Amino acid sequence: MLRFRNILAAVSAVLLLGLASSYMPIATAGDLPTEKGCKTLKEADSVMKGWCAAITRRKGNCLSCHHAIVDNWPETLPPGGNIGPPFVAMGARFPNSEDLRAQIWDATAKNPNSSMPPFGKHKLISEKDIDNIVAWLSTL
Protein backbone atom coordinates (compact mmCIF):
# COMPACT_ATOMS: atom_id res chain seq x y z
CA MET A 1 0.00 0.00 0.00
CA LEU A 2 2.86 2.37 0.80
CA ARG A 3 4.41 1.70 -2.61
CA PHE A 4 1.09 2.58 -4.30
CA ARG A 5 0.90 5.89 -2.42
CA ASN A 6 4.47 6.76 -3.39
CA ILE A 7 3.75 6.04 -7.04
CA LEU A 8 0.52 8.03 -6.87
CA ALA A 9 2.34 10.97 -5.28
CA ALA A 10 5.06 10.88 -7.94
CA VAL A 11 2.54 10.78 -10.80
CA SER A 12 0.56 13.63 -9.23
CA ALA A 13 3.69 15.75 -8.89
CA VAL A 14 4.63 15.17 -12.53
CA LEU A 15 1.12 16.11 -13.68
CA LEU A 16 1.10 19.29 -11.60
CA LEU A 17 4.50 20.33 -12.92
CA GLY A 18 3.31 19.67 -16.47
CA LEU A 19 0.24 21.83 -16.00
CA ALA A 20 2.23 24.63 -14.39
CA SER A 21 4.81 24.65 -17.17
CA SER A 22 2.16 24.70 -19.91
CA TYR A 23 0.76 28.05 -18.75
CA MET A 24 1.65 30.73 -21.27
CA PRO A 25 0.75 34.40 -20.82
CA ILE A 26 -0.74 36.22 -23.79
CA ALA A 27 1.49 39.26 -23.38
CA THR A 28 4.75 40.34 -21.87
CA ALA A 29 5.50 43.29 -19.61
CA GLY A 30 4.25 46.55 -20.98
CA ASP A 31 2.32 44.98 -23.86
CA LEU A 32 -1.20 45.53 -22.56
CA PRO A 33 -2.19 49.18 -22.80
CA THR A 34 -4.85 50.92 -20.77
CA GLU A 35 -7.90 52.48 -22.43
CA LYS A 36 -5.95 55.72 -22.78
CA GLY A 37 -2.98 53.86 -24.25
CA CYS A 38 -5.23 52.15 -26.77
CA LYS A 39 -6.13 55.54 -28.25
CA THR A 40 -2.49 56.22 -29.10
CA LEU A 41 -1.68 52.83 -30.67
CA LYS A 42 -0.55 53.45 -34.22
CA GLU A 43 -0.08 49.91 -35.44
CA ALA A 44 -1.79 47.05 -33.69
CA ASP A 45 -2.76 43.58 -34.78
CA SER A 46 -6.29 42.24 -34.44
CA VAL A 47 -5.48 40.65 -31.07
CA MET A 48 -4.34 43.96 -29.55
CA LYS A 49 -7.29 45.77 -31.14
CA GLY A 50 -9.53 43.13 -29.56
CA TRP A 51 -7.98 43.76 -26.14
CA CYS A 52 -8.56 47.48 -26.63
CA ALA A 53 -12.20 46.98 -27.64
CA ALA A 54 -12.71 44.70 -24.63
CA ILE A 55 -11.51 47.34 -22.16
CA THR A 56 -12.86 50.48 -23.84
CA ARG A 57 -16.05 51.75 -22.26
CA ARG A 58 -17.45 53.09 -25.54
CA LYS A 59 -16.86 49.79 -27.31
CA GLY A 60 -17.24 46.24 -25.99
CA ASN A 61 -16.32 46.93 -22.37
CA CYS A 62 -16.28 43.13 -21.94
CA LEU A 63 -14.22 43.31 -18.78
CA SER A 64 -16.92 45.17 -16.89
CA CYS A 65 -18.82 41.85 -16.71
CA HIS A 66 -16.16 39.21 -17.40
CA HIS A 67 -12.84 38.43 -15.73
CA ALA A 68 -9.79 37.58 -17.84
CA ILE A 69 -6.61 36.00 -16.58
CA VAL A 70 -3.75 37.82 -18.28
CA ASP A 71 -0.25 38.66 -17.17
CA ASN A 72 0.70 42.28 -16.56
CA TRP A 73 -2.79 43.62 -16.05
CA PRO A 74 -2.51 47.43 -16.37
CA GLU A 75 -2.39 48.95 -12.87
CA THR A 76 -4.96 51.65 -13.63
CA LEU A 77 -7.48 49.18 -15.07
CA PRO A 78 -10.05 47.93 -12.56
CA PRO A 79 -10.26 44.16 -12.13
CA GLY A 80 -12.65 42.29 -14.39
CA GLY A 81 -16.26 41.74 -13.45
CA ASN A 82 -18.06 38.70 -12.14
CA ILE A 83 -21.46 38.93 -13.85
CA GLY A 84 -20.57 36.82 -16.89
CA PRO A 85 -18.42 33.70 -17.12
CA PRO A 86 -14.66 34.27 -16.92
CA PHE A 87 -12.55 34.34 -20.07
CA VAL A 88 -10.68 31.11 -19.40
CA ALA A 89 -9.71 28.46 -21.97
CA MET A 90 -11.67 30.28 -24.65
CA GLY A 91 -10.02 28.35 -27.47
CA ALA A 92 -11.12 25.08 -25.87
CA ARG A 93 -14.61 26.35 -25.05
CA PHE A 94 -15.10 27.78 -28.54
CA PRO A 95 -12.91 25.78 -30.94
CA ASN A 96 -14.92 27.26 -33.80
CA SER A 97 -14.39 31.03 -33.73
CA GLU A 98 -17.69 31.55 -35.56
CA ASP A 99 -19.53 30.15 -32.52
CA LEU A 100 -17.76 32.67 -30.29
CA ARG A 101 -18.53 35.46 -32.74
CA ALA A 102 -22.20 34.44 -32.80
CA GLN A 103 -22.26 34.50 -28.99
CA ILE A 104 -20.94 38.07 -28.93
CA TRP A 105 -23.17 39.15 -31.81
CA ASP A 106 -26.34 37.93 -30.04
CA ALA A 107 -26.06 35.87 -26.86
CA THR A 108 -29.85 35.81 -26.58
CA ALA A 109 -30.09 33.60 -29.68
CA LYS A 110 -28.97 30.59 -27.63
CA ASN A 111 -30.21 31.80 -24.27
CA PRO A 112 -33.14 34.26 -24.30
CA ASN A 113 -32.52 34.96 -20.60
CA SER A 114 -28.90 36.00 -21.14
CA SER A 115 -27.90 39.26 -19.46
CA MET A 116 -25.30 39.84 -22.18
CA PRO A 117 -26.40 42.56 -24.60
CA PRO A 118 -26.67 41.51 -28.26
CA PHE A 119 -23.70 43.66 -29.31
CA GLY A 120 -23.92 42.98 -33.04
CA LYS A 121 -27.66 42.68 -33.42
CA HIS A 122 -28.20 46.06 -31.76
CA LYS A 123 -25.11 47.58 -33.43
CA LEU A 124 -23.55 48.45 -30.07
CA ILE A 125 -20.11 47.79 -31.55
CA SER A 126 -18.88 47.40 -35.10
CA GLU A 127 -18.52 44.09 -36.92
CA LYS A 128 -14.75 44.72 -37.06
CA ASP A 129 -14.59 45.22 -33.29
CA ILE A 130 -16.43 41.92 -32.82
CA ASP A 131 -13.88 40.20 -35.09
CA ASN A 132 -11.02 41.76 -33.11
CA ILE A 133 -12.53 40.73 -29.76
CA VAL A 134 -12.87 37.17 -31.07
CA ALA A 135 -9.20 37.26 -32.12
CA TRP A 136 -8.16 38.38 -28.62
CA LEU A 137 -10.42 35.93 -26.79
CA SER A 138 -9.09 33.06 -28.91
CA THR A 139 -5.65 33.64 -27.38
CA LEU A 140 -6.93 33.01 -23.86
Range-by-range predicted roles:
Residues 1-37:
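N-terminal export/targeting leaders of redox proteins
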Residues 116-118:
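Methionine-biased hydrophobic packing positions in alpha-helices, especially
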Residues 74, 109-114:
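Substrate-binding/catalytic groove segments of enzymes
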Residues 63-105:
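Gly/Gly-Pro-rich "capping" loops immediately C-terminal to redox-active cysteine motifs
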